[in-house]
From Swiss-Prot:
Natural source organism: Leptothrix cholodnii (strain ATCC 51168 / LMG 8142 / SP-6) (Leptothrix discophora (strain SP-6))
InterPro entries linked: HtpX_protease (IPR050083), Pept_M48_protease_HtpX (IPR022919), Peptidase_M48 (IPR001915)
Gene behind this protein: htpX
Membrane topology: Multi-pass membrane protein
Cofactor annotation remark: Binds 1 zinc ion per subunit.
Compartments, record wording: Cell inner membrane
Positions annotated to bind Zn(2+): H144, H148, E222
Name the UniProt record assigns to this protein: Protease HtpX homolog
EC number: 3.4.24.-
GO molecular function, one term: metalloendopeptidase activity
Alphabetized UniProt keyword annotations: Cell inner membrane, Cell membrane, Hydrolase, Membrane, Metal-binding, Metalloprotease, Protease, Transmembrane, Transmembrane helix, Zinc
A cellular component annotation (GO) from this entry: plasma membrane
Length: 291
């Protein structure tokens, strides 16, 4: 269930490239030198914010395959592969979406769904998941991922990320201009040191606030996908068992390079604010309390 983390990492990379390109083309100097047209700045911020988010969305499926080494198994004759494909097909039909690509990758117990459109998505399962869970538990995890696709969560998170990106780009530059021109009284043509330092600092600080907001929305989508899996299965019990089993897996077993993307991490303290997934205990409790 790595799709949000993969999306956010790609989005940050795209935003960084767009930001560097804008600086090289002189956009920052233009806004600081022309009295800062707020309407023009807002338009620029929206292009930067939503551009980065939607480019990340379009790149999400190939990036996920590349980063995990996932192999598509839709046409594989292997019995286990056929069972996985048939399970995804059955749940997709119930959810009213087109059949996604189904992939398998080597790794710790995990799964993810991604793709720019719900009718051309990818559902991937790790070998570790197949080895550590019973079939009904694996089905519950697959149902969870199909529910993400059916709910349009990738597009929803893209829109939220785009709004947050726009917020960060606009406010950091508007405040940077105010500090540079009004507080430090820079009257030279082009941005001064106050603008540049303030913009960089606020990009970081506001980016942290934006990340917490995006993570909060992501956690709500996880609860909804859990409920969707229970509905597709016709029972809450398999999803509860799958979550309980994941909760017993030591997060330290995951490689450091992908530890932040695992479903079974247990962030605590302030780091919980940046987690894309709620605590396992909360997810089980929500399923138990659902009608």
């Amino acid at each position: 269930m790595k799709r949000i983390a993969l999306f956010l990492i790609t989005n940050l990379a795209v935003m960084a490239v767009l930001g560097i390109t804008a600086s090289l083309l002189g956009f920052n100097r233009y806004y600081a030198a022309t009295g800062l047209d707020l309407g023009a700045l807002l338009g620029f911020a929206m292009v930067m914010g939503f551009g980065g988010a939607f480019i990340s969305l379009l790149m999400s499926k190939p990036m996920a395959k590349w980063s995990t080494g996932a192999v598509v198994i839709n046409d594989s004759p292997e019995p286990m592969h056929r069972w996985l494909v048939d399970t995804v097909a059955r749940f997709s039909k119930r959810a009213g979406i087109e059949m996604p690509e189904v992939a398998l990758y080597e790794g710790e117990p995990n799964a993810f769904a991604t793709g720019a459109f719900k009718n051309s998505a990818l559902v991937a399962v790790s070998t570790g998941l197949l080895q550590s869970m019973s079939r009904d538990e694996v089905e519950a995890v697959i149902g969870h991922e199909v529910a993400h696709v059916a709910n349009g969560d990738m597009v929803t998170m893209t829109l939220i990320q785009g709004v947050m990106n726009t917020f960060v780009v606009f406010l950091s530059r508007a405040i940077g201009y105010f500090i540079d021109r009004v507080v430090l009284k820079n009257d030279r043509e082009g941005p001064g040191i106050g603008y540049m330092v303030t913009t960089v600092v606020l990009d970081l600080l506001l980016g942290l606030v934006a990340a917490m907001i995006v993570a909060w929305f992501s956690r709500q989508r996880e609860f909804r996908a859990d409920a969707g899996a229970a509905q597709l299965m016709g029972s809450r019990v398999p999803m509860q068992r799958a979550l309980a089993r994941l909760g017993g897996i030591d997060p330290g077993e995951l490689p450091q390079s992908v530890a932040t993307m695992g479903i079974n991490g247990r962030p605590s303290g302030i780091m919980a604010l940046f987690s894309s997934h709620p605590p396992i205990e909360d997810r089980i409790r929500a399923l138990q309390q659902s009608a």
